Amino acid sequence: MLMLMLVAAVTMWLRPLVTAQPLCRARTVRTGKVFNVIQDVQGDRLYFRSTTTRLIKHPCKKNIALYLGKQVFFTTDNFETSLLPFTIPTSMQVGVPEVTSAHFTGSLLLLVVNHKVYTYDYESNSWNLSLGIKHPVTHVSGDNCCYTGSLFCVDVSNLVFAYFRGDQISQTYIYYSNTGGFSFWKYHYDRQAEIVGSLGGIFHLFSLSQVGMLVVDQGKGMFKYSDHPLNRSLGLSFDYNGTLDIVIAPGQKGILLLWFEKSLLFSRNAGQLVDTVRVKKGEQTLFTSIFEAQITIHNIAVNENELAVITREDNLYYGNLGIVPSSIIKFAHQHIWSEDAALMFRSSGILEILTPVRDTAFAAFDFQKCLLNIQAILMDPDLHVGRCNIEFLKGEFTYRMYTIDMHSQLELTALLIPQPGTSLIPLVMVSNPHSLGFQATFYESGYTSDGNTKYKLDIYLKQQQHWGRTDFNFTSSLKRATMSTLTVDIANKEISCVDIKPLSTLISVGCDLDKKIVIQNTVSACSKGVLDALALQDNYSFIIEKEFYDPGFQGRQSSKDLHVFYSYQQLGCPLLVYYDTPWKPVVELWKKDRFQEVVDAEYVLLEVNGQFSYSYSLTAKSAMCTSQPQNWTTMIKESGGPFFWNRENYVSCHDPNNDAPLRWPDVQYQILGGRTANQIVFSHNNGFYVFYISIVDPYYSYCQLETVFSIYVYGAFPVQLVSAGVVMVLLISSILGSVWLAYMIPRLLRTARGRRMTSFVAQLYGRCKTVCQFRASATARTGSKPMGRHRSS
C-alpha cells in the first residue's frame, strides 16, 4: 500500500515536469563576426510597416526566403548565417524605403517599395525598376509552379499582377506581367467600370484557370472570376473585417488563406466558398472562428498541406489543410512569442520559429531558431489527438505533371493500406471540375505479410465535356486550354497523420508538346528518278517566274523573278505530284517517334514564297458554307502578316453561331480536310512548291500543329502554239494531197506533155552523170597526198 502511494506521489510530481517540457529548444545562429572587421550597411534600409511580421519562402527553392518586419532580411541558406539588413541601392532613388508587398518569380524577388515595383535578381545581385507601371501600386501577386522541365510551369511562374489594394475597382489601374516582373502592361478586366466596391486583390488562380478579383463592399468580400462558367456570378460572400492578406498555398490546389490579426478564413476552391477556421480540441469544436476565440494572430505559416499560427497571447496553433472544414488545435501554452517572431515550415511536420536578434557590436543580425517536431508534439495525450489510421498511401503520379490533350485520357493508380482494425474513406478531388472529369474505382487488391488488407484506387480522367454528364453551363469552353490539380486524400484522416501527405499531381488540359504533324511522303521525286537527292543537297536553287508569285501574298504578279535556294536539310526530297490530278496532302499525327493517326481535321496551306499558280476545287457555295468563309487575303490583312491563321482565330463557315453572311458564294474555299472534299488544283506548270500547313480545327488539339514541306509538280508539257484542230486539218489535208498526187502523176505521164517532161528529165540525168564521172577520174590522177615533199621508202 505504501509503495502504491509512493508511485502515485512521484507520478503527480513528474506530471507538471512532463507538461512543462518546451515545445522547442532554441539555438542562435551567429556567424562571420570577427572583431577587427567592421561591416557597414550600404544603401537604403528596407522596412515593413506592420504590427505583424511576414516570412515569405520561395515555393520551389526551399532555402530562399524573405523576412519582413521592422528590419527586412533576405537569405539564400534558410537564415543559417548572420545577415545585414536588406537594403536597396541609393541609386534607385526610392524615396521612403517602405515595403508593402513581395513575391518570388524564378530567380527574381519582386518588391513593392514606395508604390513602385522593383526586381532583385539574387543570382546576379542586381536591382531594376519594373517597366510599364505608370500609376502607384501597393501589392504584387502571383503563383509558382515547381514541376521541373515544363514550359507550362515556366509560364505559370512568370505571370504577375500589380495593383493598388483598397482602390475603387471602377477607377483603379491594374497591371500584369508575363515576364516574371521585368515589364508590365495594363490589364483590362471585363466590365471593370461597372464593378461596385474596392479592390481586395487580384490573382491568377491556376487551379481554376481563372483570374480572380476580390471585391470588397459594405463589409463583405466576394470573388469575381474572369471566364465562363464562373464569370456569370460572384462567389459566396463572407465577412470582411479588417484588411485581409491573401496567401495562396503552394501546389496549385486552390487553397487560399485570408487573414489579419482578428480573422482567419480558408477556401479550398479558390474563393468560391470561404469559411472560418475553427479551433478544436480533439473532436470537439471549441470556437467556430478566430474572432470568437478572442485571439490575436501575429504570424502564420503555410505549406502544401499544413497551417501554423502564432498569436500575441503566446500560443501556437496547428492544423492541416485537409478535405474536412479546416481547423486548428492549440499546443501547450509556453513563452514562444515576441514581436519579431515569424513562422516557417522547414519541411513537412517540421516548424521553425525565427526571431532576428540585434547585436550591439555588429551591424549584422543573429537569428534565434526554435525547431518544432509536430509529430512528436501531437503525441501529447492532453491534445486528445487520435492515432493515425493510415499505414500506407502512395501513388506513382506524385511530383509529376501530366497533359491531357483534346480527346485524350489519363489513367492513374494509388495504393492504400489502413492500420489494422480501421477503415479508410478515400476521396478523389480535382481543383477544376469545369474542365476535368474523372471516374474512380476502389477495390481490395490483396494482403500484406501481416494480414492487413491492401486497397487499390484506379482513376480515369478526361475532359469534363467528353464524359457527357454535365450541363453546358457548368463546363468551361472546350476551345480554351486549362489546368487542374488532382488530389487523393483520406476523408477520415486524423490530424496525427503528419507524415501521410495527400497524393497530388498537376494536370494540364492543353497542348501535348510531344505531338507534331508529318506529311506523308511515300512517293518522292527522288525515289522516282525525277530529281537527284545529291544535287538537291549541293546548294540547289530554282527560279520562280515573276508572273507566278507575289511577295505580299495577295495574288498579284511581281516585278522580277525570284531566286530560291532549296533547303534539303529542312525539307528533304519533295513529294511528287502530277499536275493534272487534284491533290491534297496526307497529314499524319506523331507523338515523339510514334505514329498516332491520319489527321482528318481542317487545315490550311500557304506557299511560303508567295506562289499563286494553284487554286481550290471547291467554292464557298459548293463547300456548303452557311456564312462567308475566311481566306488568306483577309487573315493576312487582319494579322498584319502571313502564317498567323491558326486554331485561335479560325472560324468555320459551317458554324451555326457564325453570323457573317454569305455574300460571295463563288469565292474559293481555302480550307482543306474536315467535312469537305476540297483539293488543290495546279496550273499548267512544273516546279517546286514549298507549303506551310497549319491545323486550324480548334477541337482537334490544343497545340499549334504546323510544319513546312515541299512538293514537285511534274507532267506539264509545253503549251502548243497551234491548236490541235488546226494540226489535225493540216495532217488530213497532206494525206489526201499525197493520195491525189499518186493517182494523177501516172495519168499525166501518158499524155504528150508527160512524154516531153520524161524526155527532159532523162537528158538532164545523162548530163549530170557525165559531169560526175569526169570529176572522179581527175581526182584519181592527182592522188591523195598533200602538196610538199614526201620521203619515199
Curated annotation (Swiss-Prot):
Disulfide bonds join C24-C370, C60-C146, C145-C153, C388-C497, C511-C703, C526-C573, C625-C653. GO terms for cellular component: CatSper complex; sperm principal piece. Residues 748-793 are cytoplasmic. It is found in: Cell projection, Cilium, Flagellum membrane. The chain crosses the membrane at residues 726-747. Keywords: Cell membrane, Cell projection, Cilium, Developmental protein, Differentiation, Disulfide bond, Flagellum, Glycoprotein, Membrane, Signal, Spermatogenesis, Transmembrane, Transmembrane helix. Residues 1-20 form the signal peptide. InterPro entries: CATSPERD/E, CATSPERD/E_C, CATSPERD_b-prop, Ig-like_CATSPERD. It is a single-pass type I membrane protein. Glycans are attached at N128, N231, N241, N473, N539, N631. One of its GO terms (biological process) is spermatogenesis. Residues 21-725 are extracellular. The keyword Membrane applies. Belongs to the CATSPERD family. Auxiliary component of the CatSper complex, a complex involved in sperm cell hyperactivation. Sperm cell hyperactivation is needed for sperm motility which is essential late in the preparation of sperm for fertilization. Required for CATSPER1 stability before intraflagellar transport and/or incorporation of the CatSper complex channel into the flagellar membrane. Component of the CatSper complex or CatSpermasome composed of the core pore-forming members CATSPER1, CATSPER2, CATSPER3 and CATSPER4 as well as auxiliary members CATSPERB, CATSPERG, CATSPERD, CATSPERE, CATSPERZ, C2CD6/CATSPERT, TMEM249, TMEM262 and EFCAB9. HSPA1 may be an additional auxiliary complex member. The core complex members CATSPER1, CATSPER2, CATSPER3 and CATSPER4 form a heterotetrameric channel. This is Cation channel sperm-associated auxiliary subunit delta. It comes from Macaca fascicularis (Crab-eating macaque). The lineage of its organism: Eukaryota, Metazoa, Chordata, Craniata, Vertebrata. The gene is CATSPERD.
